[in-house]
Structure formats: structure tokens, C-alpha cells
Amino acid sequence: MKTKFNIRFIFPALVITLLLAAAFIAPSKPVFYIIGDSTTRNSNRPQCGWGEVVGELFDTTKISISNQAMAGRSTRTFISEGRWDKVMSTIKAGDYFLVVFGHNEGSAPDTTKNGRRGVLKGIGEETKELTLKDGKIEVVHTYGWYLRKFVNDAKAKGAIPIIASMIPRNEFRDGKVMRANNDYGKWSAEVAAQTGAYFVDLNSITSDKYDKLGPDETKKLFPGDHTHTNIDGARINAASVTEGLRMLKDCHLKDFLLQK
């Protein structure tokens, strides 16, 4: 009788204890995933990508930053090398995802070292078949097609996608930084509108800052070439990203930003 009494009362108590414990377990933090090229992540010091410092502007006790960008990659090679599959294996509902490319896509798509990164221009459904050295066939798509894939795949996992226009280069013409309004920046905006992704016009926001700095001061942000910034330039671009996020009416990623 004593054994039956214990089982009868201890088992319900154990169930209640487990339920209470589960209720107090903190839910996992959302993750802010970032993919891009060397303007976002760059280990070749003194060069530095904005994704390496953007965590300074977020409350990382409430959100995690996962910078999956890789130098030298394009929208095409980020997928073909399996890097996108890696992101998709961990991204979950409620996470945020930002994609920013545009620097490595310009070569004509072929099987050469540079051509392997190239994509077709525009946002259409055009394709080009390439026979690789191992005999495999690769179907190359437009820049817009690759952006749509990123957005649609992220949405399918319940993540919130954001497209950003490419980081501007240190290229001035008539006293103004050359914008990407006629190609990769334009196509990024069009795909964002087409897919319902949020859009941050990073190219314009940072270009406006460079215009104010002028060519001489802007040059100080670019050690060695006209594409890759130092840490000061990276922080300018990171600030531009957060400024763009604050402009997005319904994107709650901005709720995780540290107050100005």
C-alpha cells in the first residue's frame, strides 16, 4: 500500500515540476544571418568587412549575429560551393537574413577563374549552360534569379529576408561617388519589390556619406584598392545598414539595435 501511495502522488508531482521547468526555459535567441562577399567579411587585414563590426550596434544579449559572408564569392558561387546549404541547415523561423552582393558578378559567366563567378545581367529567367572541367553541367542564372532563390528559401524556413544594395566603391566622377543605380543596386531593389523582401539601399546611404567626405577623406578608408575598406570604413557601412533598417516601417530587426 505504501508503494502504491508513493507512485500515485509522486508521478503527478513530477509531471508538474517538468512542466514548470519547461515554462521557465528561455526561448532561443533569434539569429541575424548575413551573406555577402569580402566587403562584408574580410580577413586580409587591415581590410575589414562591415559584417565583422555590425554586432557593435546590436544588443547581442537578445539576438545573435552570424556573418556567413565569404571573400571572393558571388551569388552564384555562394550557392554552388554549398555555403547557402550550410545557412539553410540552421536558419529557423523568426530569424533574420540579409543578402548583399554585386562585386564579383560582373565577369561573363564561363569556366575561367573569373568567369566561374559571373552571372547573367538583370532579373529575368534567362539561363546559360556551362560544361565544367569535370564534365558536369552548370546552369547559370541572372543576378535577380539568385537573389530570389535566397529570399524564397529563407521565407520557406520562416525567416525574414532583407536585400541590401551593394557597397559602393571608392570611385568618384564629377565630385560624386558612382552609384549602382543602373545595375546591381537597381536589380536588388526590383527583386525586393518583386518578392516582398525588405530593402536597404546601402549603396545610396553610404555613397551620400562619401560625397560629404570628399575624395581625399574617402580614400583614407580604402587601404590598397578601391573596393575594400579598413575598419573605419567598415563601421561607416555597418552604420549605413542600421540606418537603413531604422527606415523600414515593419521590420522588427531594428528593435534589436542599441539606442543611439
Task: Describe each PLM feature range.
Residues 1-9:
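Positively charged n-region of N-terminal signal peptides that target proteins for export
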Residues 4-5, 83-231, 235, 239-258:
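Alpha-helical cap/lid subdomain in secreted, periplasmic
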Residues 8-12, 16-29:
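Bacterial Sec-dependent signal peptides at the C-terminal "C-region" and cleavage site
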Residues 25-71, 85-97, 113-122:
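Serine-esterase "nucleophile elbow" of acetyl-processing enzymes
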Residues 44-46, 78-79, 174-179:
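Short, solvent-exposed loop/turn segments at secondary-structure boundaries
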Residues 69-72, 103-105:
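Short glycine-rich, polar/acidic loop-and-turn segments at beta strand-coil junctions
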Residues 74-86:
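N-terminal post-signal-peptidase region of extra-cytosolic proteins
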